[in-house]
Design a protein with these regions (language model features):
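Outer-membrane beta-barrel transmembrane strands
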Residues: 206-222, 231-233
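Periplasmic plug
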Residues: 22-69, 101, 188, 192, ...
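Extracytoplasmic beta-strand/coil segments of soluble accessory domains associated
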Residues: 2-44, 62, 72-92
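Outer-envelope beta-barrel architecture signal
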Residues: 23, 37, 94-98, 211, ...
């Protein structure tokens, strides 16, 4: 995203959000609905078709953008969507120079969670909804209260079908004042399992550590110019089981063998391991696989864990 805001008209979007995911770059807008609108990347004079996140930013000396006729004149049709020229580092001083840098940081969700109703308010709101549905159709208050009492936990008839409160025998969960019974205790056991709601937001999102290390050596003489580097990145995401690890290496050597002969090599290696939960199931963004969707829409009465009758989290032996 370094080029965003530095070149007029360039757009960069990272719609995925997963650690290590490459951004979508548009230099000349959208010119086709069926063909690719991605620019051509050229690294040290060679067209590059790989993932941009595979290039260690610490190895980049400069980045420039061609977006006008110059792109077409040099690269033809391949430059129709613009060209991004990347030049990697080389030696600047004659003496051998070793550079090491380490970076530490933290990844956190900066957008606060919505202010949502709690467990008690959710039951109260559902009860009031059932009551009003009968009043709206002409039923008496007594009939409406009776309907709400019977239907609140009846999933087949529009109720919640789920109880996470222990209510004394003979008493109702919600009174005729539409408030939770003060004698109701959060947490319910049927003898086999214990039911209590969890904070899905706190369970799904967390602040995690990010660390990056890079070391390079470079130098030059009248005939030799060399640059070599290795890098390691461990970037943990803000949701559980999301992370990106990258190992990079680069060796760039130029040698003036004769006045008329110059030989060189530029080799790069990248190994990356990316982990991220599914953000959609098929074509449905509102699926249970989308943790962002679920954590923001699930009712505050449902648990995240299966618990034993004593309240401890059940562990699957398999």
């Amino acid at each position: 995203r370094d080029s965003s805001g530095q070149v007029a008209g360039i757009q960069t979007v990272n719609a995925n959000g997963a650690p290590g995911a490459s951004a979508t770059v548009r230099i000349r807008g959208i010119g086709s609905m069926s063909s690719s609108n991605a620019p051509l990347y050229v690294v040290d004079g060679v067209p590059y078709d790989g993932d941009m996140s595979s290039i260690n930013p610490q190895d980049i000396e400069s980045l420039s953008v061609l977006k006008d006729a110059a792109a077409n004149s040099i690269y033809g049709a391949r430059g129709a969507n613009g060209v991004i020229l990347i030049t990697t580092k080389s030696a600047k001083t004659e003496k051998a120079k070793v550079t090491f840098d380490a970076k530490w940081g933290s990844n956190s969700r900066m957008v606060p969670q919505y202010d949502v109703i709690g467990t008690a308010e959710y039951y109260e709101t559902q009860y009031k909804t059932l009551y009003n549905s009968k009043i709206y159709t002409g039923s008496s208050k007594a009939e409406a209260y009776n309907y709400a009492d019977k239907t609140l936990l009846d999933a087949k008839n529009g109720g919640l079908g789920y109880l996470v409160y222990t209510v004394p025998d003979g008493e109702k969960l919600i009174g005729n004042n539409f408030k939770l019974n003060p004698n109701a205790k959060l947490g319910y056991s049927d003898g086999k399992y214990y039911y209590t709601p969890d904070d899905w937001y706190d369970e799904v999102f967390s602040s995690n550590f990010r660390q990056e290390y890079n070391v390079n050596i470079s130098g030059r003489s009248d005939k030799l110019n060399y640059y070599a580097s290795v890098g390691y990145l461990n970037d943990s995401g803000i949701i559980q089981n999301s992370a990106y690890k990258r190992y990079t290496g680069r060796a760039k050597v130029d040698y003036q063998a004769k006045e008329w002969l110059k030989v060189g090599t530029n080799i790069a290696y990248t190994y990356s391991d990316s982990q991220a939960p599914d953000y959609q199931d098929g074509d449905s963004w509102g699926s249970s696989a989308n943790l962002f969707y679920v954590s923001n829409t699930i009712a505050p009465i449902y648990p995240l864990y299966v618990r034993n009758a004593d309240g401890s989290i059940a562990i699957n032996p398999n």
